[in-house]
């Protein structure tokens, strides 16, 4: 279980309050697929991902970005039980979808870049530290089935 200070909880909540899932989700997944092209192998049914423009204009990529961020947002309401909250998703991604668990980390890195771009100087080092701790807890929970 991850231990959270009151300040860390406030910082994570503050970051989430600045995130528009419908905007940041697609941007984060698009960035992930472009910067780390090997992650595209899990999205063959999404159609054309052959160019940056194709990825950015792909409605299935955008929709899945929203799904991914909506799922990530779930942890905010379950910060004291993140591992159990993501147990079923961990099983799905490992046993059925066979997703490399490092891809969760890559997506979260891309999300942090998107969030930092949106928040600018309002994303203080303390806020970022709490945000990174939150993302690491979720990534660990999603990768739990692989251990």
From Swiss-Prot:
<dbReference type="GO" id="GO:0031838">
    <property type="term" value="C:haptoglobin-hemoglobin complex"/>
</dbReference>
<dbReference type="GO" id="GO:0004601">
    <property type="term" value="F:peroxidase activity"/>
</dbReference>
<dbReference type="Pfam" id="PF00042">
    <property type="entry name" value="Globin"/>
</dbReference>
<comment type="similarity">
    <text>Belongs to the globin family.</text>
</comment>
<dbReference type="InterPro" id="IPR050056">
    <property type="entry name" value="Hemoglobin_oxygen_transport"/>
</dbReference>
<feature type="binding site" description="proximal binding residue">
    <location>
        <position position="93"/>
    </location>
    <ligand>
        <name>heme b</name>
    </ligand>
</feature>
<dbReference type="GO" id="GO:0046872">
    <property type="term" value="F:metal ion binding"/>
</dbReference>
<keyword id="KW-0561">Oxygen transport</keyword>
<dbReference type="GO" id="GO:0072562">
    <property type="term" value="C:blood microparticle"/>
</dbReference>
<keyword id="KW-0813">Transport</keyword>
<dbReference type="GO" id="GO:0005833">
    <property type="term" value="C:hemoglobin complex"/>
</dbReference>
<comment type="subunit">
    <text>Hb 1 is a heterotetramer of two alpha-1 and two beta-1 chains.</text>
</comment>
<dbReference type="GO" id="GO:0005344">
    <property type="term" value="F:oxygen carrier activity"/>
</dbReference>
<comment type="function">
    <text>Involved in oxygen transport from gills to the various peripheral tissues.</text>
</comment>
<dbReference type="InterPro" id="IPR012292">
    <property type="entry name" value="Globin/Proto"/>
</dbReference>
<dbReference type="GO" id="GO:0043177">
    <property type="term" value="F:organic acid binding"/>
</dbReference>
<dbReference type="InterPro" id="IPR009050">
    <property type="entry name" value="Globin-like_sf"/>
</dbReference>
<dbReference type="GO" id="GO:0042744">
    <property type="term" value="P:hydrogen peroxide catabolic process"/>
</dbReference>
<feature type="binding site" description="distal binding residue">
    <location>
        <position position="64"/>
    </location>
    <ligand>
        <name>heme b</name>
    </ligand>
</feature>
<protein>
    <recommendedName>
        <fullName>Hemoglobin subunit beta-1</fullName>
    </recommendedName>
</protein>
<dbReference type="GO" id="GO:0019825">
    <property type="term" value="F:oxygen binding"/>
</dbReference>
<dbReference type="InterPro" id="IPR002337">
    <property type="entry name" value="Hemoglobin_b"/>
</dbReference>
<feature type="domain" description="Globin">
    <location>
        <begin position="3"/>
        <end position="147"/>
    </location>
</feature>
<keyword id="KW-0349">Heme</keyword>
<dbReference type="GO" id="GO:0031720">
    <property type="term" value="F:haptoglobin binding"/>
</dbReference>
<keyword id="KW-0479">Metal-binding</keyword>
<dbReference type="InterPro" id="IPR000971">
    <property type="entry name" value="Globin"/>
</dbReference>
<dbReference type="GO" id="GO:0020037">
    <property type="term" value="F:heme binding"/>
</dbReference>
<keyword id="KW-0408">Iron</keyword>
